[in-house]
Amino acid sequence: MNSLQVLTKKVLIENKAFSNYHEDDSFILQQLGLWWENGPIGFCKQCKMVTGGSMSCSDVDSYELDRALVKAVKENQTDLIKLFVLWGAEINFGIVCAKTERTKVLCIQLGADPKFLDVGLYNMFVDLIKQQKVLLAIDIYYDNISILDSFDSHDFYVLIDFIYNGFILNLDEKEKITKNTLVLKFWYKFAIEFNLVKPIRFLGKKFPHLDDWRLKTAVYLGNVDEIHHAYFQENIRLDPNHMMSLACMYPQNKLGIYYCFALGANINTALEALIRFINHELNRPFFSNYGIWSNVHFCISLGANPYTKKIQEILLREEKYDIMKLLFKKGLLSPHSILHKKILEPSEVRKIISTYQYTETFHSFSSLRDNVR
């Protein structure tokens, strides 16, 4: 049951009673539990967002209701916990973050499932993925050692690898990453992959030591909006050729490859790196990895020369390159005129790639397979 004090706070906050507060009132508001971050607490019923002071719902630092609950639980703010649950926050998110037995008991009294810590953690992780709740997931798992340790080590890595494994192989060394860092990078990568702008901005502000990693991730996943933002608005810079080597590793990454090319990466070097990557990684039939081979085709469409001495030397070493030798015959692969311009505006880049894909006249790989037999 909610106390009169909690109900009174609810009414005052919903009616924006403190929107024009005086600075001298800040101490009193803090003591009464009516303060959030840098100002009087506010709540938007429509957006289900908790704000502080003049903060708007769209601000990077605003909190969705479940995140606000997690923060209140971590800080043992009893009245705010009750208030957020009254507004509709999911109390099970709170119980997994409770640091004291008293707060855990309060969560149970407010409706949390006592068995959730034993049976609900995996389902919660998957649900957060489905709902794309990146910041909520990081609030719950990051620095929550007791929760991370409750995962069986094998099961934990199986769960993370479900989405993250190939990425780790190409960008991180998993054996050197703690569970804590792995969880953070898992969700950070997820935000970049789906271009979730608010989580990306929030995490960029909170974890500046990962700025280079963020740019690499954006390149690897072909998120040209984030590459542009990091490169030109935040001045995060890496060698374009190194960025290109990352872009080439991700299947069918036309956006990432083109953007690195537009930034000045050497397209012949990119093709050489791709062929070496194929030699190292792919010992399977040609058509089982169409995505990587399509990157080869795209590099040539951008003007890469498959007849350089280095590339020809690589091709001569292995019989498995017979099909690639066929692809490199004159007339079969050639530069595409629409890709000659180097454009850096993300929306224009997407238009160019879309037009390229529409006007592409290259024979389908399936027909080539028939010709090779």
Curated annotation (Swiss-Prot):
Name of this protein: Protein MGF 360-6L
InterPro entries in the cross-refs: ASFV_MGF360
GO biological process: taxis
Primary role: Plays a role in virus cell tropism, and may be required for efficient virus replication in macrophages.
Family in the record: Belongs to the asfivirus MGF 360 family.
UniProt feature coiled coil, ranges: none
Lineage: Viruses, Varidnaviria, Bamfordvirae, Nucleocytoviricota, Pokkesviricetes
Pfam families reported for this sequence: ASFV_360 (PF01671)
